[in-house]
């Protein structure tokens, strides 16, 4: 009863915040990055709780190694802290978003390709070029992940970097076009299929759709077009979930699990509630630590790009500590990794104080990309890195981190020069 009451209050507050942000995304002349972040938090942290009451609490018979999540999901104190945590973050995002909405000219949405067009167009087709010159093109006649295609890790890393760079440049080129016709829409459709096929993973489709959405809302001024997307976006999200179900049941089924259940695997993929409750339960109820010392994996998150050869005692990535705790296996012997979340990462590092710290850190991170002189490319990168902080592991997105650092340095230099010239 207490769990249901806590969840109901959390869902009521968060649904109101998400509804306001969703409406503001489409009906304000300028879309703030924070509103899309609110929707992502709601999808990953609140929707799974709704599914607990409408579809059922997962038993994890499919992914049986996640049965360790169940005690935390049933513990009243853990659920109470989780609900407080999510409400705290959502309200922080709401108040920040409301203050930003009062300033309708705080970012620059105009992006002129100019002299960069030829290099960006080359970057768009870079993944195909790499496939051809590497001799791996025949391996891509099937839709599968890198393991099924027999690709080595080095090539997969390079190919992923090229895919991310390609997607970034394509999004800027496509939505930087003032007049988009049906021919342009066809190109968008074909391009998305091609990168999805090359990647062989579902996350690239979700990433592409989110980047397209943000770029569209940042550049499209036609109210009718924005209103149409406002109405059909939930259908597109449902289609993405259906594609994920198809992928897990047809493309990459788990043959080594019992009583295969697509719903449970979707919960594992899209939900971050269970893993966050797991961390809260381990630390707050059982008194067990996930990391070795406070701030350890925050440090590894920020400095992940430093090679271990240079820093031998460098902490591992957070997902490795998390997975080690879940599987009770040493980090050096992990068979795979559990997808992390900024929510549980901050709690794992700082305990209860990590809840307000994460809310503040998320706001500060968003604000970095919402300042007055932030251009469309930097805002787009900021969005992706916010999503990574919320739902992924940072090491896969090295190319975006490098691009972000370059653009932030460029913005700082430009701002300093403008100050000197005006003084």
Where are these regions (language model features)?
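Membrane-embedded catalytic interface detector for glycan/lipid assembly enzymes
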Residues: 59-80, 94-222, 239-253, 325-327
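Long extracytoplasmic/lumenal interhelical loops at the membrane interface
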Residues: 293-353
């Amino acid at each position: 009863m207490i769990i249901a009451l806590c969840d109901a209050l959390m869902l009521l507050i968060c649904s109101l915040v998400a509804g306001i942000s969703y409406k503001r995304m489409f009906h304000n002349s300028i879309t703030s990055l924070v509103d899309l972040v609110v929707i992502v938090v709601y999808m990953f942290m609140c929707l799974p709780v709704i599914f607990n009451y409408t579809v059922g609490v997962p038993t994890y018979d499919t992914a049986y190694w996640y049965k360790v999540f169940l005690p935390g999901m049933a513990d009243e104190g853990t659920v109470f802290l989780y609900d407080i945590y999510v409400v705290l973050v959502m309200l922080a995002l709401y108040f920040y978003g409301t203050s930003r909405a009062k300033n309708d000219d705080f970012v620059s949405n105009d992006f002129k390709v100019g002299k960069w067009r030829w290099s960006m167009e080359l970057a768009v087709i870079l993944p195909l070029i790499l496939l051809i010159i590497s001799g791996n093109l025949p391996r891509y006649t099937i839709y599968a992940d890198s393991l099924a295609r027999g690709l080595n890790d080095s090539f997969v890393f390079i190919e992923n970097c090229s895919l991310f760079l390609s997607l970034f440049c394509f999004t800027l080129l496509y939505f930087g076009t003032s007049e988009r016709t049906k021919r342009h829409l066809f190109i968008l459709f074909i391009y998305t299929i091609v990168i999805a096929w090359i990647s062989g993973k579902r996350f690239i489709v979700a990433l592409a759709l989110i980047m397209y959405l943000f770029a569209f809302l940042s550049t499209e001024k036609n109210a009718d077009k924005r209103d149409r997307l406002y109405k059909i976006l939930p259908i597109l999200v449902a289609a993405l979930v259906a594609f994920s179900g198809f992928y897990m049941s047809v493309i990459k089924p788990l043959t080594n699990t019992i009583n295969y259940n697509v719903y449970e695997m979707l919960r594992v993929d899209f939900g971050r509630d269970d893993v966050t409750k797991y961390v809260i339960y381990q630390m707050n109820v059982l008194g067990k630590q996930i990391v070795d010392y406070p701030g350890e994996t925050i440090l590894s998150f920020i400095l992940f790009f430093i090679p271990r050869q240079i820093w031998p005692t460098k902490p591992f990535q957070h997902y490795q500590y998390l997975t080690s705790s879940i599987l009770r296996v040493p980090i050096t012997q992990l068979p795979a990794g559990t997808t992390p979340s900024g929510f549980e990462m901050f709690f794992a590092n700082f305990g209860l104080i990590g809840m307000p710290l994460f809310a503040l850190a998320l706001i500060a991170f968003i604000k970095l990309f919402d300042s007055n002189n932030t251009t469309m490319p930097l805002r787009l990168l900021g969005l992706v890195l916010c999503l990574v902080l919320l739902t992924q592991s940072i090491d896969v997105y090295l190319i975006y981190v490098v691009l972000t650092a370059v653009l932030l340095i460029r913005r700082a230099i430009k701002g300093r020069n403008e100050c000197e010239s005006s003084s």
